């Protein structure tokens, strides 16, 4: 079963339910509502094994673990190498050391996320890396849209960034990079969220005819195949799952040179200086103007994506869960 604090049902919940997974939705408008503590407790006491993701659910579940009389196993996952709470160590470090002590095991989505958490909260003995994974064949075997189907000419270059619009992601730098490139370069944004600030930058750079907002989509494999280059610009990152999806589609990727995502594209994709639109634009142009280099990077990216198969992720979690249930720790 999956319990989501957000009371609003979305397409992902529908997909889970079609796969036979029971999805329970919260009852409050804000996921931070303290009453969620009681809502969660009502459900958690029905289960023997609880796996929490993200703030504030991690806090709520940690508190509930202290209230449970019956022995249960609690696991959480660290999804990022940084968050805003770490800007105030005098306040949050003592709190989070206590929070993470409530968990029997902590998985991190990358080595960078694990190192950052261990340094922050002293979790080294109970943490381990379990990389995210994707259903590779869905992307490898996808049939991409034609350039005409996505509104482009055959000679146009499609650059795609798949990322929700929120503070972690840097959607402005790719816009500025596209503005530095010739007219044939187009940028496609796939993801939900507030696009107002990004649209303002698009207007400021006068590239409204070359930047396309597609919103949340269920056809990402086809869009990935239709693109020429994948980009992920972030201020901080734990993993960068969308980058693996683009690589699995056989497309080269260019990502911010930061912890987490650097680890994912290691030895395959290209890195650009974080926030440097000129560096990003130069790398986009270089790939498209040097076909042999493009093919080499694309091939490396597709090969690298094979390291992030969802089957491997499932196997590693199954091993972890089994060890915890049998009292063998995180081994």
Residue ranges and their predicted role:
Residues 1-31, 129, 193-195:
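N-terminal strand-loop element at the rim of the active site
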Residues 3, 252-255:
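Short hydrophobic beta-strand element within catalytic cores of glycosyltransferases
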Residues 9-17, 118, 186-209, 293:
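Short, structured helix-loop element that forms part of the nucleotide-activated donor/catalytic region
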Residues 31, 35, 115-119, 126, ...:
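Acidic anion/phosphate-binding donor-loop and adjacent secondary structure
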Residues 52-60, 78:
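Short His-centered aromatic/hydrophobic patch
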Residues 157-180, 196-197, 278:
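A conserved mid-protein helix/loop that constitutes part of the nucleotide-sugar donor-binding site
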Residues 216, 235:
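Aromatic "clamp/platform" in nucleotide-sugar-dependent glycosyltransferases that forms part
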Residues 255, 270-277, 286-291:
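Conserved acidic donor-binding segment of nucleotide-sugar-dependent glycosyltransferases
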């Amino acid at each position: 079963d999956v319990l989501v604090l957000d009371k609003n049902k979305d397409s992902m919940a529908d997909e889970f339910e079609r796969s036979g997974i029971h999805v329970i939705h919260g009852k409050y408008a804000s996921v931070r509502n303290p009453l969620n503590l009681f809502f969660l407790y009502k459900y958690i006491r029905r289960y023997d094994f609880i796996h929490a993701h993200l703030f504030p659910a991690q806090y709520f579940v940690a508190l509930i673990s202290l209230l449970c009389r019956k022995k249960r196993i609690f696991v959480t996952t660290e999804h990022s190498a940084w968050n805003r709470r770490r800007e105030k160590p005098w306040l949050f470090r003592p709190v989070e050391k206590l929070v993470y002590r409530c968990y029997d095991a902590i998985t991190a989505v990358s080595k960078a996320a694990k190192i950052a958490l261990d340094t922050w909260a002293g979790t080294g003995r109970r943490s381990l890396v379990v990389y995210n994974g994707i259903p590779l064949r869905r992307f490898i075997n996808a049939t991409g849209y034609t350039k005409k189907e996505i509104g482009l000419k055959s000679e146009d270059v499609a650059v795609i960034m798949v990322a929700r619009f929120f503070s972690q992601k840097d959607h402005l730098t790719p816009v500025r990079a596209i503005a530095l490139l010739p007219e044939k370069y187009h940028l496609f944004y796939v993801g939900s969220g507030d696009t107002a600030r990004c649209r303002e930058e698009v207007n400021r750079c006068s590239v409204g005819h070359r930047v396309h907002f597609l919103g949340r989509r269920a056809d990402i494999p086809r869009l990935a195949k239709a693109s020429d280059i994948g980009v992920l610009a972030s201020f901080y990152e734990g993993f960068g799952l969308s980058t693996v999806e683009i690589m699995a589609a056989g497309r080269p990727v260019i990502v911010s040179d930061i912890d987490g995502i650097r680890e994912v594209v290691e030895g395959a994709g290209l890195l650009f200086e974080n926030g440097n639109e000129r560096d990003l634009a130069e790398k986009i142009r270089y790939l498209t103007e040097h076909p042999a280099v493009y093919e080499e990077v694309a091939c490396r990216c597709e090969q690298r994506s094979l390291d992030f198969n969802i089957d491997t992720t499932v196997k590693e979690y199954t091993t972890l869960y089994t060890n915890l249930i049998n009292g063998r720790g995180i081994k």
